[in-house]
Amino acid sequence: MHEQLSPRDQELEARLVELETRLSFQEQALTELSEALADARLTGARNAELIRHLLEDLGKVRSTLFADAADEPPPPHY
């Protein structure tokens, strides 16, 4: 036999369904945010590595372009 729910029980049932629905959406949002954070961390790590390499390359270029003046031969008028 199937009993009819009282109005109070129906209200509680509706509230429970609403809360379960909200929880489901929040869990989905949390999963998406977690994935986005993981992607951002990977991107940040890659960018940090790229910057490190670029700074090394820049240092090499600077040392080539702006060599120590003591290493340069004197100008011809000396």
UniProtKB/Swiss-Prot annotation:
Membership in a protein family: Belongs to the SlyX family.
Name of the protein: Protein SlyX homolog
Source organism: Xanthomonas campestris pv. campestris (strain ATCC 33913 / DSM 3586 / NCPPB 528 / LMG 568 / P 25)
